[in-house]
From Swiss-Prot:
This is Hematopoietically-expressed homeobox protein Hhex. GO terms for biological process: animal organ morphogenesis; anterior/posterior pattern specification; B cell differentiation; common bile duct development; embryonic heart tube development; embryonic organ development; endoderm development; forebrain development. It is found in: Nucleus; Nucleus, Nuclear body; Cytoplasm. GO terms for molecular function: chromatin binding; DNA-binding transcription activator activity, RNA polymerase II-specific; DNA-binding transcription factor activity; DNA-binding transcription repressor activity, RNA polymerase II-specific; HMG box domain binding; RNA polymerase II transcription regulatory region sequence-specific DNA binding; sequence-specific DNA binding. Its main location: nucleus. Keywords: Cytoplasm, Developmental protein, Differentiation, DNA-binding, Homeobox, Nucleus, Phosphoprotein, Repressor, Transcription, Transcription regulation, Wnt signaling pathway. Interacts with CD81; the interaction prevents nuclear translocation of HHEX. Interacts (via N-terminus) with SOX13; abolishes the SOX13-mediated inhibition of WNT-mediated transcriptional activity via competitive inhibition of the SOX13-TCF7 complex. Interacts with EIF4E; the interaction inhibits EIF4E-mediated mRNA nuclear export. Residues 245-261 have a biased composition (Acidic residues). PROSITE patterns: HOMEOBOX_1, HOMEOBOX_2. Residues 212-242 have a biased composition (Polar residues).
Length: 271
């Protein structure tokens, strides 16, 4: 009995299991010869090639998790200060993610917390530069008048150097000021007016004439200081014997005229 000679097609069937390459795979069971097994680590997942992070990538969430202990103002609790993670965060936290790879390491909450931090006195840290003084107040508590109020006060002062209480009340109501503010403004303005008179004595006579005419029209008496500076006869306005004998007796206690000459002298000497 003769067997047929095997053809060339039968040879590959025998050679496939003999010459097929077998891939080198890590054994499934742990062995004591691999470094990962010695260190007790499992098979690590393949790490992708590092690329530049984008705002939409998962790198943002990774940065926020490592950035929290770095920029948080609360220090690390002493019980966890010896932990290696705390030392790692302190060593690599500020510079690891604050470089050019991620130019915006802080979120809005970080800057908001910085603005709301408080100093030991209990005031906000960045609050003092934004404090503004009231516009109508100066340093020292002096009142700053508006331009319209100053113009009206100057007009009134040109025609009348002294105000009676009813006139002062009416002027204060018109300018929306208090009577004390109007009185103080006139005192300071008279002190400035006297200082200018001393610097320019030639205008004393003209000012005295103008004040005398105004006083005669309004039925008011001039203060004693203006009488001493002007060479005029008091009998032109009111020829009373009391005023000719004693110029200081013209201002009675019952008069409505405001008497603040001493206060003006004190302000002038202080200035």
């Amino acid at each position: 009995m003769q067997f047929p000679h095997p053809g060339p097609a039968a040879a590959p069937a025998v050679g496939v299991p003999l010459y097929a390459p077998t891939p080198l795979l890590q054994p499934a069971h742990p062995t004591p010869f691999y470094i990962d097994d010695i260190l007790g680590r499992g098979p690590a997942a393949p790490t992708p090639t590092p690329t530049l992070p984008s705002p939409n990538s998962s790198f943002t969430s990774l940065v926020s998790s490592y950035r929290t202990p770095v920029y948080e103002p609360t220090p690390v609790h002493p019980a966890f200060s010896h932990h290696p993670a705390a030392a790692l965060a302190a060593a690599y936290g500020p510079s690891g993610f604050g470089g050019p790879l991620y130019p915006f390491p802080r979120t809005v909450n970080d800057y908001t917390h910085a603005l709301l931090r408080h100093d030991p006195l209990g005031k906000p840290l960045l609050w003092s530069p934004f404090l503004q003084r009231p516009l109508h107040k100066r340093k020292g508590g002096q009142v700053r008048f508006s331009n319209d109020q100053t113009v009206e006060l100057e007009k009134k002062f040109e025609t009348q150097k002294y105000l009676s209480p009813p006139e002062r009340k009416r002027l204060a109501k018109m300018l929306q000021l208090s009577e004390r503010q109007v009185k103080t403004w006139f005192q300071n303005r008279r002190a400035k007016w006297r200082r200018l008179k001393q610097e320019n004595p030639q205008s004393n006579k003209k000012d005295a004439l103008d004040s005398l005419d105004t006083s005669c029209e309004q039925g008011q008496d001039l203060p004693s200081e203006q009488n001493k500076g002007a060479s005029l006869d008091r009998s032109q306005c009111s020829p009373s014997p009391a005023s000719q004998e004693d110029p200081d007796s013209e201002i009675s206690e019952d008069s409505d005229q405001e008497v603040d000459i001493e206060g003006d002298k004190g302000y002038f000497n202080a200035g």
